[in-house]
């Protein structure tokens, strides 16, 4: 899994039938020190994440099975909203201090 920040949404009125009702988010990936990387991806949202929240992203075949246990044509899915991230006893992110 990877860590990313929600930086936007994608709206699509015409899509593959199995994607009906799926919410899509624009994500910006983060580096090991919590810095924002110039890497973006669109992911299906399974947890109701909002703007600027840090999230865990599952990719590949695991992401395709997360939504209702069926194969859907997605490459990435948001599977958790992060409360805190720390590394080497240093707090990189806390949702509590962000809001």
UniProtKB/Swiss-Prot annotation:
Domain BMV as annotated: residue spans:
1-83
Which InterPro entries did the record assign?
A: CcmL, EutN_CcmL, EutN_CcmL_sf
Keywords in alphabetical order: Bacterial microcompartment, Carbon dioxide fixation, Carboxysome, Photosynthesis
In terms of Pfam families, this protein maps to: EutN_CcmL (PF03319)
Gene3D superfamilies from the xrefs? EutN/Ccml
HAMAP family recorded:
CcmL (MF_00858)
What does the record give as the function of this protein?
Answer: Probably forms vertices in the carboxysome, a polyhedral inclusion where RuBisCO (ribulose bisphosphate carboxylase, rbcL-rbcS) is sequestered. Has been modeled to induce curvature upon insertion into an otherwise flat hexagonal molecular layer of CcmK subunits.
Question: Quaternary arrangement and interactors, per the entry?
Answer: Homopentamer. May interact with CcmK2, this occurs at very high CcmK2 concentrations. Interacts with full-length CcmM.
Please give the name of this protein: Carboxysome shell vertex protein CcmL
Gene (UniProt): ccmL
């Amino acid at each position: 899994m990877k860590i990313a920040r929600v930086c936007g949404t994608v709206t699509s009125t015409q899509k593959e039938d199995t994607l009906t009702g799926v919410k899509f988010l624009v994500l910006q990936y983060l580096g090991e020190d919590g810095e924002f990387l110039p890497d973006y991806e669109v992911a299906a949202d399974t947890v109701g994440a909002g703007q600027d929240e840090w999230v865990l992203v599952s990719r590949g075949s695991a992401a395709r099975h997360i939504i209702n246990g069926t194969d859907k044509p997605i490459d990435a899915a948001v599977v958790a909203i992060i409360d805190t991230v720390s590394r080497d006893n240093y707090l990189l992110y806390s949702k509590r201090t962000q809001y």
